[in-house]
Amino acid sequence: MSEKHYVVSLHKGFNKDEIINDLNRDTTLDSKVDSNIIPDRKVDNVNTRPSSKRMFEIALTDEEAIKLQNDPRVGGIEVPEVWSDDWLDYEQGADWTREVAVDDLTRGNWGLLRQISKTNAWGLNTTNDLSAGTTYDYHLDGTGVDYIHQEGSKFRYTHEQWQDRNGVSRLVPFQWNTLPNCGAIPTIDYTNVTGAGGHATHCCGTAVGKDYGWAKNSAIYNIPYLSLDQAFWFDAIKEFHRAKAVDPVTGFKRPTVVSASWGKKANFTSITDIQFRGASVGSVKSADFGMIGDTNGRFNAATFGLQAEVEEMQDEGVHYFKSAGNQKQKLCYSGDIDYDNHIIRSVATGSITAGDPVYYNRGAGNIGPDTVVVGNLDSMLYNNIEATNEGSDKGPRVDVWAAGTDIVSAHSTDDTAIYQRDGTSMSTPQVAGMSCLLLQLNPGWTPAQLRKWWHDNSI
């Protein structure tokens, strides 16, 4: 009998202990347990995930996993995800030039001025600086809010952008293995910059950097995933937020804001069947079926497990911001005519087994009901009006659009380095950083309330 390590995700509202108890005992003679669903043997736990109400990890054969999927309590059964940098979504007084033909690092983050104005201050002159003396003026700076950058790589811990106005670093050298149920997380050396990622550093700089970011006084945290099991990707953040005491001044816990400029990817290759709007339409990729993808033929692939992880984390009160993706796909809600569009592949797609549906209009799996999904507002104009970037995912599940093209922010090569990048990865920390300012004023807001604010106040 060949067993594999599987992650089981339950639908919301079911008792995890009950199903684990059924699996951990031999139920051969128990007539109340369906042997066509629960194996007639004692199943071994791999990780009971005590920090989670809906997730646990067990050892099953492939056949047993298929049968267990028929349990009405079970939403998904997948092999554990392994982080891949392929999932990344990127392709003050300053020069505020918005659109540039070549990289220009003398500029500021043009999103700082675009996102505080109802209109396009550049007019048709997006390749020019704004008038002399134009500044980004602010009084909110994210004080009292904890910002977490969530990604595989760490950002450069010693970069000057993490300093406050007095030159003191706001980076909290937090050891995640001090949290309950997180003892297996490796200790982080916050003096070691080896392996720091440019993408992570740039994104963090846009959210909380002292020059390029919004939340210039938020506390800054990092949880790099390259060396972590999937079990800790969200459980550690849940435990972090649970452990907070109520602030006697505000009457609430310090808000936790997480920015995630990544998403699980799949390829429009090795296709054996395409299901489009309820019908099989062959096995050849076509834009007629909403199959576009990026230049490498990739799209964001949904999994129930990652969705459940995010939803459970947000149920704890954590605010989560997710990049829409740069794969030119439509993202939609359940009930949309394209929500169930999927392909069947002859090979596995990471945690998705060969032969199982790979949905291509749901976005990446790490999107919960209260997640704010951010698209890329282009720096250039189309027919003299502002528009989304051509590569950005679009559709009704994109909540808000923010500056994401020609964005200057921090780089990982040294402590003062900056560079320019494009993508929904760059848009997302704009909104996460602005949300730190909103939560500074409204620390008791739930994730649903904050997302509603964006819906009500975006234009």
Model-derived features with residue positions:
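Substrate-binding/access-modulating region of protease and related hydrolase catalytic domains
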Residues: Y225-N366, T413-P429
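Acidic glycine-/aspartate-rich tracts in secreted/extracellular proteins
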Residues: G13-F14, V82-W83, G152-R156, W162, ...
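N-terminal domain-start motif of subtilase-like serine proteases
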Residues: T61-E64, D89-H149, I188-Y190, A301-G305, ...
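Extracellular S/T/G-rich loop segment that most often corresponds to the catalytic His/Ser-adjacent loop
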Residues: E151, S346-Q440, G444
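Sec-exported extracytoplasmic/periplasmic mature domains
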Residues: N70-R73, V208-Y212, K238-V246, G263, ...
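Short glycine-/aliphatic-rich beta-strand segments at the starts of folded cytosolic domains
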Residues: S2-H11
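Subtilisin-like serine protease catalytic core
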Residues: G108, N125-D235, T250-V257, A266-S270, ...
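Autoinhibitory propeptides
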Residues: T27-K118, N326
